[in-house]
A protein has these predicted regions:
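Conserved catalytic or regulatory cores that recognize and/or transform ribose-phosphate-containing ligands
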Residues: 1-134
């Protein structure tokens, strides 16, 4: 079983915190040089991985990960996992951003995708799913 680690980049360390907790394979799309080949590989892995995870943190500068998460929650809800971390190395969302993100979480949850609030909860779920026979 494998998971695509999508979501906030911008020197956010959530992936560094989550990866040691995982007992499954993963694809980390973060690269030093974002090329057309890297983009193609990311799209391929989003399709191939058993789960696609989107972790959103206050270090987010663009909104495309939110679009991807919403799209995947519509097209592949059983494979989509979404999480909003409200603090990232001292950075926090504004109250207005939090309201929008809460609405996004509700939309994704209503699409029957999984929504978690902590990296530990994500790891527990993925590790459990890794033990379940296909």
């Amino acid at each position: 079983m494998d998971v695509f680690l999508g979501g906030t980049c911008n020197n956010s360390e959530w992936r560094d915190e989550l990866i040691p907790l995982l007992n499954c394979d993963y694809f980390n799309p973060v690269v030093d040089d974002w090329t057309e080949d890297a983009q193609k590989l990311e799209l391929q892995k989003r399709i191939e991985c058993d789960f696609v995870l989107y972790v959103i943190t206050p270090k987010m500068t663009g909104v495309y990960s939110l679009v991807e998460a919403t799209d995947d929650s519509n097209k592949r809800p059983q494979r989509t996992i979404f999480c909003v971390l409200t603090n990232d190395d001292g950075n926090e969302f504004t109250e207005s951003q939090l309201k929008s993100l809460e609405m996004t979480k509700n939309l994704i949850r209503n699409n029957n995708a999984r929504v978690f609030d902590t990296l530990q909860d994500i790891a527990s779920f993925l590790n459990y799913m890794n033990l379940v026979p296909n």
